Regions:
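A general structural motif
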Residues: 1, 52-56, 90, 125, ...
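ATP-binding/phosphotransfer module of carbohydrate and carboxylate kinases, centering on a glycine-rich
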Residues: 1-51, 169-319
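Glycine-rich beta-strand-to-loop/alpha-helix junction loops that act as flexible
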Residues: 10, 57-63, 98, 133-135, ...
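Short, acidic Gly/Pro/Ser/Thr-rich loop/turn segments
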Residues: 14, 64-66, 136-140, 195, ...
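Short beta-strand-loop/turn "lid" adjacent to the catalytic site in phosphate-handling enzymes
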Residues: 49-95, 100-113, 265-268
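Active-site nucleophile and cofactor-binding loops and adjacent substrate-binding regions
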Residues: 72-75, 94-101, 120-123, 130-133, ...
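ATP-dependent carbohydrate kinase catalytic cores
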Residues: 92-123, 214-226, 233, 241
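Glycine-rich phosphate-binding loop of actin/hexokinase-like ATP-binding domains
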Residues: 116-183, 268, 274-280, 286
């Protein structure tokens, strides 16, 4: 089928892919600000790839998609799903959350599209979880049903932060006084890196020289600031503990995947961190989680791949 498109829409860019025989044929990226509406962007894409019209489409977008009216939180675009489908003369239009698309990409990823961290082998039919520290902390589960892979939506990034060591307690106390309640997102996100750094600085009686996560991670990777190194080191440890909790929540024997931009930017620092050690530090259940693999997603097009996987599953169900 060559009359299909998928889109991955963020606050800055929209990336679109033309589909032929169930595979991505061509990819184009545009600035969202180039177009007044998303319909204009999709129409321009069709012109650029020589496709007069599409029959099926799937849009993965970074905002809530529960209702017919979709309003982006980090851009001016808004649209009615039904009206957009009619405007583009589509038989089917599916609109899913961008993190749901990431989840749907996971069963399609090959070994060279991920970086495996630690031991464990995936059960191909086992439950899967993906989480992604970024601007916030997204969490999504996948489970295999007779109809195919189904996402289990939730707000896992907003569970309570559970301290595991003395440094965690220092961070928790600092944020508890500052925020009242400390969620996982307050330590596992861009601002989470800043929060950890600030807590360690205050505890050590040192000045808080940096308030940008990029500045802190840059100095941690370069090894030029001991407090920045300590903050990012603890960030990786906390991420491991959180990932282990997710694995236990739904027995994710199919693997735990890490998306979002932060972990991938940390690169070797993250791979060589104590992430996996903390992931397996589950007391009586250490033997269980040590058999669950953990992966860092290393595929820049995973949003498009996930939207495609979802679209193919939906068109198969209706045929």
């Amino acid at each position: 089928m060559s009359n299909m498109f998928v889109a991955d829409v963020g606050g800055t860019n929209i990336r679109l892919a033309q589909i032929e025989n169930g595979q991505i044929k061509a990819i184009k990226k545009y600035l969202c600000t180039e177009f007044d509406t998303i319909a204009e962007a999709i129409t321009q894409f069709g012109d650029d790839v020589g496709q007069d019209s599409f029959e099926h489409g799937c849009i993965a977008i970074a905002c809530p998609v529960n209702h017919d009216l979709v309003k982006m939180t980090n851009h001016t675009w808004q649209f009615s799903k039904k009206a957009l489908r009619d405007e583009l003369s589509l038989s089917q239009l599916h609109v899913i959350n961008d993190f749901s698309a990431v989840a749907h990409s996971l069963p399609t990823l090959s070994a060279d599209q991920v970086i495996k961290i630690g031991r464990g082998e995936a059960d191909p039919k086992g439950n899967i979880v993906v989480f992604g520290p970024g601007t916030g902390l997204g969490v999504e589960h996948l489970t295999l049903t007779a109809a195919g892979w189904q996402t289990l939506d939730g707000e896992g990034g907003h569970v309570d932060f559970a301290p595991n060591d003395e440094i965690d307690i220092v961070i928790w106390r600092y944020l508890k006084e500052k925020l009242g309640r400390v969620s996982a997102e307050e330590v596992l996100s861009g601002r989470g890196i800043v929060n950890i750094y600030s807590a360690l600085a205050v505890n050590a009686g040192e000045p808080e020289d940096y308030n940008d996560p990029a500045d802190i991670t840059e100095r941690a990777l370069a090894g030029t600031d001991t407090l920045c190194v300590a903050a990012v080191t603890q960030f990786c440890r906390i991420m491991g503990s959180f990932a282990g909790n997710l694995a236990l929540n739904l027995c994710t024997t199919g693997g735990v995947f890490i998306g979002g931009g932060i972990a991938s930017r940390l690169g070797e620092f993250f791979v060589n961190s104590e992430f996996r050690q903390q992931f397996e530090a589950k007391g009586n259940f250490a033997g269980y989680v040590e058999n669950i693999p953990t992966y860092l997603i290393n595929e820049p097009d995973h949003g498009l791949l996930g939207a495609l996987a979802y679209l193919l599953q939906q068109t198969k169900e209706t045929n």
